[in-house]
Amino acid sequence: MPDPNLPDISPDSFDAVLFDLDGVITDTARVHAAAWTETFDDYLRGRADATGQPFVGFTEHDYLAYVDGKPRYDGVRDFLASRGIVLPEGSPDSPPDEESVGGLGNRKNVLMRERITRDGVEVFDGTVAWIHALHARAIRVAVGSSSRDTTLVLEATGLRDLFEAQVDGLVRAELGLSGKPA
């Protein structure tokens, strides 16, 4: 008997279903937000101390407006621009303590990876049940994310084997695809 809580999807109607990772399969938004907050608050506090200007922390509005769902370095640039701050670009190889777009982005990534490894990531059980139901109906399932850490998240949650295809920030960079719009 079909699950009444799941949409009636048949292989005759769909070849595959693509799920977004962040906010659909896993609650990584909380982990991302905490890592961004720690990164930017540390930077902004140091900047305030050095310039004598008041410290104004990174907010939930800042997270949603400037960094959520974007490639990491785009998020750094957009947030800093919102505060009138211009930093050197740096590079993807910039050390996480470097005062640059690359350095701040890499610092956020170090903090996020530490949190995922230490604390894990919450999974939305209803979505996982739906994925299993799709498999039972022989419908292919893929996962998409702008994150370069999709594999880390899937492995931390034990979900990696549920997906036949994965398109993420690593694939985006490899193929030169644009990220989500600013």
Where are the regions that the model predicts?
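A short, compositionally biased domain-edge/stem linker segment
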Residues: 1-8
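Short alpha-helical
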Residues: 31, 71, 129, 148-152
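Hydrophobic packing residues within well-ordered alpha-helices of enzyme cores
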Residues: 36, 76, 127, 150-154, ...
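Catalytic-core regions built around general acid/base machinery
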Residues: 126-137
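Substrate-recognition "cap/lid" segment bordering the active-site pocket of phosphatases
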Residues: 139-142, 148-182
